[in-house]
Amino acid sequence: MGLKIIYGRAGTGKSTFCINQIKKKINNSPNNKLILLVPEQFTFQTENKVLSAIGERYVLNAEVLSFKRLAHNVFNECGGATRTIMGDAGKSMLIFKVLEDLGDNMTVFKNASRQKGFIDIASKTITEFKKYNVNNEVLDLTINEIEDENLKMKMEELKDVFNEFNSRLHEGYVDEEDQLLLLNEKLDGCSLYDGAEIWIDEFSSFTPNQLSVIGKLLKRAKSVNITLSIDEVNSLKGESDLFVATKNTEKRLMNLIQEEGIAFSGYINLNEDIPYRFKENKELAHIERQLYAYPFKQYRGKNNSLRLYRANNNYDEIEFVAKDILRLVREKQYRFKDISVICRDVDNYEKVVSAIFSEYEIPYYIDKKIDIASNPLIVFINSAVDIISKNWTYESMFKYLKTGLIKEFRGIEGAELIDELENYVLAYGIKGKKWMEEWVNYSSSILKEEEISEENKQRLERLNDIRETIVTPLDEFNKQCKGKKTLKEFATILYEFLDSKLDIMDTLDKYVDYFKENDMAIEAKEYSEVRDIFIDVLEQAVDVLGNEVMDLNEFMKVLNIGLSQYEMGLIPVALDQVNIGDITRIKSRGTKALYIIGVNDGVLPSASKEEGILSDNDREILLEKGISLASDTRTKIFEEQFLVYTAFTIAEEYLVVTYPLADFEGKSQRPSIIVHRLKKILPNVKEESEGFKLVDDKYEKISAKIPTLNELMIAIRKNYDGAEIEDYWKYVYDWYLREPKWKERIEYVRKGLEYTNLENNISKEKAKKLYEDNKNKISLSVSRLERYAQCPFAYYIQYGLKAKDRKIYEFTAPDLGSFMHEILDEFTNEIKEKDLKWSDLSKENCRNIINSLVDNQVKNNKSSILNSSKRYSYFTDRFKRILTKSVMVISEQMKRSDFEIYKNELAFGFSKDVNSIKLDLPSGESFYLNGRIDRVDKLNLDGETYLRIIDYKTGSKKFDLNKFYNGLQMQLLVYLDALINNSENIVENQAMPGAILYFRIDDPILKSKGDLTEEEIKSEVLKELKLEGLLLDDVKVVKAMDNTLEPGTHSLIIPANMKKAGDLGKNKALITMEQFELLRKYVNEKMVEICQNMIEGKIDIEPCKENKNIVCDYCNYSHICQFDSSLEDNRYKVIPKKKDEDIWKSINEKVGGEVNGD
């Protein structure tokens, strides 16, 4: 019976000493009971190390234990195993219920207890109390002595939570912290380890409960040997001492044996001038000794074992590490298992390390836990509950369906069914009760019902079958979950829903089998383990809270709190692989080469200052009152220092320290103080970067197949551009050509050198087939011509290949335009039927008619989107206001005008009134233009008939001569030309152009510094909604458009003003009859030019750019064309800004005639 302390700095061989001692004992006294006690996270590594050193004899004669395993052995031998141990899940669920029940009685934690994450904090505090032997009696005594009122209230409430938790827990359970207390009790009467020889390794500190267990073992064991990382004993140099934690541990151990009257067998000092691990490596030995030495000494010898690398970003950093690892394996004959990569935050680096190491074919194992929240089973359960509790939303439904767990929707065919279903659901706004109803709508319009084709009827039948398959079990589950029930009842309903109704557990088993058959060990373990975790959490929930009455949402809160406590550990899939992990979890054991990545300021050492429920000040007060708890943030800073020291002394032969200049989001980062320290203690070390590397690796670029291929591409490109490249690339190229798997890819590389982002023209025959209708005619609208002028390739994709966006159930700008146009057309018909004149309409007339028309439109189309929600009901009311205001303005415009509305929605190409515009091309083909004019007004004046076109727009629009010239705004001129050419058929005599104008449908918001009279408001509204476009420069015609226009005034309804002399003021909106003729002639030639390019198959990727306005910004096909203005072949069709007079000159030069005016 006695304690022996084995001490030494890092790398002195403490662990090796223990294993050698055990080996010697086995050889000399094979029947002795030998125990090696290590922290839980190191048991696996230690077992491997002992097995490697001692062989199979270790299995029979020695045990590697953690405190948890030790307790398990004692309970099995001496009783106590019957007490069920509550896991973290059950503990958290119980704390949740305790906090909920105490909620209204709490003051300090009343609000905090409802916050996400508080349960974890409360759980940690309870654990801390138990670890440090803080019980109810201790809390009572301490609270009475506390003078600080805030801390007193906090401790009172913590005591209530602590006591209530323990009261409910101990009805049949213990938690892991109780295990040590129970172990302490059982060891008193347990002879299991009597006479054993025990070595305790890898600990830097012990909790009071662990110290108590050690005390009991000391009384029964033959000997207890404890290793501590210490430079020298009995020499604590204050809290900044590097070894402060371990020296305090030594002090506590010495106090323990003194109090218990246990013999001290002395110290074994393993310290030497150069630690055992670094005997052959002076630089690493110098780092171990001087990293935290004050004052420090410098090592000025040659540097071979330390590299510092400054990376541009995380990707550059990990790529450097990957290349260097391959160099070590290739040139230094390292095994992958000899190499470790560590950092302070594995989660941050996991994705980039996985991607790059996989690309470089480096086998690796990431020592971390996986959060199970994203596993398909957990997503499935939460989505199923979300569906029924959140009114069958799209998001929850397709999360549920896309988990791959419903047998009807597994595999490729199942995925296609879900895609078809999703398209329909998005297109028709399926949610809520619509899932319960038969789907009957398949119309293309969101505003009107349409006749359904036979093909679409069959589709609907199939979709309804799918819907039934999905809805039936969910609906039954929904009915079963209604109202309040005990947690046990909810647990039973949920499990039966998953297992009996949907066979989810069977599906999981099939996935596990599939993963095993396909060597997907990680996935097989995940799917198998998550099922067991779910069942375990469900059972714990029933055991702990089974009789608690709650609703479904409360049940899911409890369940998810339990599930959140579980993480799955990944398993190593090979023996020879690089070990990657957090700095706190990886130990030295045989690590020849170590890469410490992410050594940035605030990251390593960590700058975390989370205090938890008890602040540093709280802990200080409690310590004064006799309660010693875990470290405060100040102490943690010094502990972090020791952690850094431990990490930097792991490598036996080679150490690489890297840091990126930018993080994953591109934010700049500074190097850690550790980097500066290394430069000071080893002044000869040179910091490397992408452009400066000290290790001359001639073949660095030849690594794994994919990265080498990438480097080969760069080399071939250089060679293609005339630059010299290394000779070995020829052999690399030949190797890829010889390999069947890579030959095709290398051909792609070669072709890529000749790549241009240009589209070859399609043949005229193909163009005809693509653009002709079923009558072998090419019929199109003006807007389509304008689309071609914007970008020929986008037109080809949209109208040639007929690519369509996924239909979404929403009210878009085109829908709004159609709706407004239709109501205005119906409004005109209505007043005609009632024999009303526009000029006679009152505000009340307008409002009543509009309200009636809109209500009928919505009422008569039950599937209309405007019937779908209160939001759209609001929109409907808003549309009524806008339309009422618009017709009132039109009425006022007509009162002030001698023009009369001749016709609304005048179609050409769709009726006998106006024929399609036929465009005969020079190549012999013909195009036919169809369209619909919103409104045509007519004026008979001095024996002449004048026509003006009004185009209704829901947005602001003005006539832009520059856009017209470039084919981007031709519509009104095309309509005008069609009208004039067909005027004898329409108005029974030859007509002349009067105007082409846009009318904005709106209810404008007026801005004014003061109150306005009703008349002023009316004038401002007329001004805001003034007609915009081109007018015939004829004072009589203009005056007929606004008969209120007087000399010296500006019109409120058209873009014109009159000088005091009575003639018209200068205005670019006014053009002469000859200019109208020029525009008509030019628009025809422009259309012929566009159509000729179209039929010749020109599909250039040539988007228009006008100032900062780029067509690509609003194009749905930019991801197809991959237009890139930085490529030599990709250029915008720039629309230069020109003065109107220059454009008129250009038009005149192109189509002839004379310009009589500006």
UniProtKB/Swiss-Prot annotation:
Pfam hit, one: ADDB_N
Positions that bind ATP: 8-15
Superkingdom of the source species: Bacteria
Residues bound to [4Fe-4S] cluster: 791, 1112, 1115, 1121
Requisite cofactors: Mg(2+); [4Fe-4S] cluster
GO terms of molecular function: 4 iron, 4 sulfur cluster binding; 5'-3' exonuclease activity; ATP binding; double-stranded DNA binding; helicase activity; metal ion binding
Cofactor details (free text): Binds 1 [4Fe-4S] cluster.
Keywords: 4Fe-4S, ATP-binding, DNA damage, DNA repair, DNA-binding, Exonuclease, Helicase, Hydrolase, Iron, Iron-sulfur, Metal-binding, Nuclease, Nucleotide-binding
EC number: 3.1.-.-
Residues passing through the membrane, by range: none
Alphabetical GO biological process terms: double-strand break repair via homologous recombination
Family affiliation: Belongs to the helicase family. AddB/RexB type 1 subfamily.
Role, per record: The heterodimer acts as both an ATP-dependent DNA helicase and an ATP-dependent, dual-direction single-stranded exonuclease. Recognizes the chi site generating a DNA molecule suitable for the initiation of homologous recombination. The AddB subunit has 5' -> 3' nuclease activity but not helicase activity.
UniProt-listed HAMAP family: AddB_type1
Note: Despite having conserved helicase domains, this subunit does not have helicase activity.
Subunit structure: Heterodimer of AddA and AddB.
Name this polypeptide is given: ATP-dependent helicase/deoxyribonuclease subunit B
